[in-house]
Amino acid sequence: MKKILALSFTGLWMLAVSGIPALAKEKIPVFTLAWSEYPSWSAFGVAHEYRLIDGRRGKLGPIEKKWGVDIELKEADYDTCIVMYGAKQCDAACLTNMDSLAPGLARASVAILPTSTSDGADACIVTKDITDVKQLKEAKVFGLAKTVSEYTFVRNLELLGEKEADYQFTNMDPGAAALAMQQKQPGFNAIVAWNPFVLETLNKRKDTHVLFDSTSIKGEIIDMVTMAQDALDRPKGMAFACAVIDTFYEINKKIEHPDTRDDALVALGEKFSHLNVESMKKVVQQTKFYSTPDAGLALFTGNEVRTTMDKVVKFCVDHEIVVKDPEIAYGSEHSNAALRFDPQFIIKVKAGN
């Protein structure tokens, strides 16, 4: 009898613990994505609102269930996203190609997705009396130093045959610089900023105009999702990358479809400085989305990105944004490069698996 009871208890115990490995297998790994308010990056906040994903830890949307990962969204201002990524406080972050280089020196990084490129979204705005770039030699030009603002300014000077040393680019937060110009504060006759500050300044102060902008350097400022190699190497790291990419393209389908376009733009606008649909239509003209897998693959597998990165790296080294020349790699081969452009995740999402 005791033997029968012992066997019974043993059987019950084995039945109970047999479920533990199954539960462990079902535990979904959590990966974090840091994002800030910007047209193409706000897509992830909108995806949460649309319930395509659930940005809360421990909650899953259909795309997360599809790929078997839990995407935790961490919204912060842009500078904080850069710091968080460099400090390993997130697995991936929405960063530009330029701003991915410095953290990549300490944390090998992979560009998994291009989201957009500036096509007028970064601009030098001046008062009506300034009509020629040479007039800026006598003025301070305010903008955020060592960012895409200074890059836009310097590259346009180069294209116009001007010397950077002849001009005064003065470090200032773009929001503060835009506000000072809008309020007609003395000395603020030229600023370099990005949207929404560009549109806000032009709308609020009618005696200003764009002297030059990022349309002259098409494709050089690339907005991306950058992921750490150490996160990719974790179990389900590739699935997380694919889930992020899948999410972005699903939102773009809503932006592109006539029946859902306006609502999607309004949702983006609410996540991006509370702009209305008409303003957002202008914004997405000036911020060209890489809205399909084919568009993303064309960039990541083409020669243009290599030429662009040569220019960006040179600028970053010359302006001491990076302490040394970062190694840039292309393709799916694992490396310890500061930044590697890898198309394999887009390819996987495009294939539907």
Tell me what each language-model feature is.
Residues 1-9:
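Bacterial N-terminal signal peptides that target proteins for export
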Residues 8-18:
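Bacterial N-terminal signal peptides
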Residues 18-24:
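Sec/Tat signal peptide C-region and signal peptidase I cleavage site
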Residues 25-174, 185-195, 211-213, 219:
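Short, glycine-/small- and polar/acidic-enriched structural segments
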Residues 42, 46, 83, 87, ...:
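Solvent-exposed, polar/charged alpha-helical surfaces in well-ordered, non-transmembrane soluble domains
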Residues 169-170, 175-274:
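Pocket-lining segment of extracytoplasmic ligand-binding domains
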Residues 233-323:
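Secondary-structure end/capping motifs
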Residues 309-353:
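Conserved C-terminal helix/tail region of periplasmic/extracytoplasmic solute-binding proteins
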